[in-house]
Regions:
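Non-heme di-metal
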Residues: 2-347
Length: 347
């Protein structure tokens, strides 16, 4: 098990030559020098993430307060359980990202991880705002803690949670790779049954404020996915032994498990009882996402026949675009919130 070194905090003897900088095990000074970055992609990522700033309470949820009691039993059950799951995921992220950052020795990447951590806190704020608006305090607490009272949801969370705990308890190059892959799976696969549910509500004219909150969260998660994909690709160049045949097999199994868990979760929480969605649509879309994420790491497709976005699900990406020039009917403000062009990437 190869060692990974925790970066020092005060290090006057650190290496200031940017050409020597590495993702892990570099002798860093921790100085944030925006004019000298080892990884050129960081500048674009940083600017995009900064320009994506938003405030949850600026989105009007009055219509949602009226709509929520009118949802069908299946829709309300799915809304509650998906929101509980999202609360858990983003809370876990804001707690875990600093653990990863302690071992990342490229200071410009640490800047990105700090922004991501902040954005995960904004997402938690958003979910709290949604819950405070639509339900009473007792209902709120019940929804908030379904991530551990619902046995299916608890099992769902154990895979990523255990991988995160492993890195906290035993730091090595291998466990660092696994925790980064776990982040990649969480950001790129785990959210999407939930996202598609909210967007389906949106295209049926329900819960417009919740849909808009999710669109901004989705946009942030896309940048987080892009960040971890690039971190992994840099690791692949700098630590090629982490991407040998045995490690690729492990990565493959992790992604497959993430895909299968997301499909099972989507079919449990959405099923065939919600107008506009069914279990087959969930499975088709998540397998497509699994291929898309896996290919972005320079690997082949995992699932034959799922290479392209399913025709039945093309509306998901349309609803996910928070930068469409459009005025929200409930608040008369442009959803082109970002001040710069969104990062174009095949993720």
């Amino acid at each position: 098990m190869e060692e990974i070194k925790r970066k020092p905090l005060f290090n006057p003897k650190g290496d200031i030559d940017v050409r020597n900088r590495r993702m892990i095990n570099f002798n860093t000074t921790n100085i944030n020098d925006f004019n000298n970055m080892r990884y050129e992609w960081v500048s674009d990522w940083y600017r995009q993430a900064m320009n994506n700033f938003w405030v949850p309470e600026e989105i009007n949820l009055n219509q949602d307060k009226s709509d929520y009691p009118k949802l069908s039993e299946a829709e309300r059950r799915a809304y509650d359980k998906i929101l509980s799951f999202l609360v858990y995921l983003d809370s876990l992220q804001s707690a875990n990202l600093p653990n990863i950052s302690q071992y990342v020795t490229a200071n410009e990447v640490n800047l990105c991880l700090s922004i991501q951590t902040f954005q995960e806190c904004i997402h938690s704020q958003s979910y709290s705002y949604m819950l405070d608006t639509i339900c009473n305090p007792t209902e709120r607490n019940d929804i908030l803690y379904q991530w551990k009272t619902d046995e299916h949801l608890l099992r769902r969370n154990e895979f990523i949670g255990n991988l995160y705990n492993e890195f906290v308890e035993r730091q090595s190059k291998d466990s660092f790779l696994r925790v980064c892959i776990a982040n990649f799976i969480l950001e790129g696969i785990y959210f999407y049954s939930g996202f598609m549910f909210f967007y389906n509500l949106g295209r049926n004219g329900k819960m417009p404020g919740s849909v808009q909150e999710i669109r901004y969260i989705n946009r942030d998660e896309n940048t987080h996915l892009w960040l971890f994909r690039n971190m992994l690709l840099e690791l692949k160049k700098e630590e090629p032994e982490l991407f040998d045949e045995a490690h690729i097999a492990e990565i493959t199994e992790m992604v497959k498990k993430g895909v299968e868990q997301e499909i099972a979760w989507g079919q449990y929480v959405i099923g065939d009882s919600i107008p506009g969605l069914n279990g087959k649509m969930v499975e088709d879309y998540i397998r497509y996402l699994g291929n898309l994420r896996y290919r972005s790491l320079g690997l082949p497709n995992l699932y034959e026949g799922y290479e392209k976005e399913p025709e039945s699900m093309k509306w998901v990406s349309q609803y996910a675009d928070a930068n469409m020039v459009k005025t929200d009917f409930f608040e008369a403000r442009s959803t082109a919130y970002a001040k710069s062009t969104a990062i174009e990437d095949d993720l």
